[in-house]
Regions:
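Cationic, low-complexity basic patches in intrinsically disordered or flexible, solvent-exposed regions
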Residues: 5, 11, 15, 40
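N-terminal amphipathic/hydrophobic targeting modules at extreme N-termini
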Residues: 15-18, 26-30, 34
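Bacterial N-terminal signal peptides that target proteins for export
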Residues: 31, 35-51
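C-terminal motif of bacterial Sec signal peptides marking the signal peptidase cleavage site
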Residues: 61-62
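Bacterial lipoprotein signal-peptidase II cleavage site
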Residues: 65-69
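Signature for phosphate-centric chemistry
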Residues: 70-155, 159-348, 352-457
């Protein structure tokens, strides 16, 4: 401490041989002493300035008087644990996915990758998403900045489709390069109850009850289409519809139980346009020549419009409570378990499809809308992140965000890092109280989610 030597300067004593640590302090104090003498002769004009100079000694140079208390350091929130639900990367279209294909004026482009599989282009996109997430998690202290994470601190689990298995493997390597983390999964093609609880028979499902509940909650497919005339017009413009007229807005809609009662049977404009819209987005994201992206008529604006048509499918199959409380329940329970268990991995990654993200989002009460996409449409390689944060006061809160590459980032395989991030959106957790939706206390979050998981009869 320099306080005694500074006091001597104030008295006018000489200070030869001062310590290096105090020399600058003494110089400032000496200057202040001379200024004080001048100030006294000038009727106090500079009192405030002298005090400021003396204050500089304390604030900048750390020469607080003995016995003083240093200001408390305000701690920033710490990210303790993360659960991520990824959608697989860019894939080739599913067999029959473009249900409105016959309305097109020209043949559809051919893909070199077999139907439903991750494309080579899509593989690179997944790697880049994973590498970015690794940088962000390292910045937050969840992953190490160098080297491998501690054993058991990272877990990756994928659904049984080949595209999700491959995406999981790519993400595991990107999140911890060279560390040998293996993305787990059940036998390829089987029904994993975590991702397909209805198909696996893990939860009760009655098609008639499902239809009744969906109709009551949403008004049905025709009601969901209300207000989307512009999106339907965009689809018609891209397809051409000169050989076969396609006035989607005038087509009838119906929703019924499937033949076996274990699913839904949807007919009408949403069924025709949702998958077709997704195929058009995949053409652009894959990097096909623009002349092959909707035959040159799928502008970015129109792609965003047909992306919304794709998302309408989830308003039938995933977001209504009857569906979400079944399709999204296993993943929701994983979130609760991993946030409650201090021994759980700090990072848990689940790799599934857009339906899983939509169902879990519905249970959480979150909505997202990223530039270039339709509202609530999960892009390829996008992810829903749920973070458990410890506040400065020790309170643990849950925060949600959505991140995904833009269509142009996917198309060009753009560089991704902390200076060149993907699209991101902080999400409000509407299952929590209004004042808690951006940072929901863990007990309130768990209680609200348990309520959401109660099955409709």
């Amino acid at each position: 401490m320099c306080s005694e030597q500074v006091a001597a300067v104030k008295r006018g004593d000489e200070q030869g041989g001062a310590d290096d640590d105090c020399s600058e302090v003494i110089r400032i104090a000496s200057l202040a002493s001379r200024l004080r003498a001048w100030q006294q002769s000038k009727a106090g004009y500079c009192t405030g300035w002298v005090i400021a100079v003396l204050g500089l000694c304390t604030v900048l140079l750390g020469c607080a008087p003995r016995g003083s208390t240093a200001p408390a350091v305000i701690q920033s929130p710490q990210l303790e644990r993360v659960v991520v639900v990824f959608r697989h990367g860019v894939r080739a279209p599913l067999q029959g996915e473009a249900a409105a294909a016959d309305y097109a004026d020209a043949p559809w482009p051919q893909w070199s990758t077999p139907a439903s599989l991750l494309t080579p282009h899509g593989r690179v996109g997944v790697q880049r998403s994973g590498a970015y997430l690794r940088q962000w998690l390292a910045q937050q202290g969840v992953l190490p900045r160098a080297g491998c994470p501690a054993p058991g601190s990272v877990a990756v689990w994928a659904n049984t489709d080949q595209r999700t298995i491959d995406s999981g493997s790519l993400l595991a390597e990107a999140l911890a390069p060279g560390c040998g983390i293996v993305a787990g999964h059940r036998q390829a093609g089987s029904n994993d109850p975590l991702f397909r609880p209805i198909e696996a028979g893990a939860l009760p499902f009655d098609g008639t009850a499902a239809v009744a509940s969906i109709m009551q909650q949403t008004g049905g497919p025709a009601a969901l289409l209300a207000g989307h005339a512009a999106e339907l017009q965009a689809m018609q413009h891209i397809l051409g519809c000169t050989r076969t007229p396609c006035d989607f807005a005038r087509m009838p809609s119906s929703l019924a139980p499937s033949t076996n009662g274990r699913g839904l049977a949807l007919e009408g404009p949403i069924d025709l346009t949702s998958g077709t819209g997704e195929v058009l987005l995949l053409q652009y994201a894959e990097g096909l020549p623009l002349s092959q992206v909707g035959w040159g008529r799928a502008t970015p604006e129109r792609l965003a419009q047909v992306s919304r048509l794709h998302a309408l499918l989830f308003d039938i199959y995933a977001r209504p409570h009857y569906m979400a409380s079944r399709s999204g329940a296993p993943l929701a329970r994983e979130v609760l378990q991993r946030f409650d268990d201090a021994q759980a991995p700090r990072l848990s990654v689940f790799v599934g499809s857009d339906t899983h993200i939509a169902a879990l989002s519905s249970l959480l009460g979150v909505h997202f809308h990223l530039p270039g996409y339709g509202a609530d449409d999960p892009p390829p390689g996008g992810a829903l992140l749920l973070g458990l944060w410890r506040q400065a006061d020790g309170t643990r809160v849950v925060r949600a965000r959505y991140l995904a590459q833009s269509l142009d980032q996917l198309r060009t395989l753009a560089r991704l890092d902390l200076d060149h991030p993907p699209l991101q959106q902080e999400l409000a957790l509407d299952l929590c109280a209004p004042e808690q939706r951006m940072a929901c206390p863990l007990p309130a979050f768990a209680q609200a989610l348990e309520t959401q998981l109660k099955l409709d009869p």
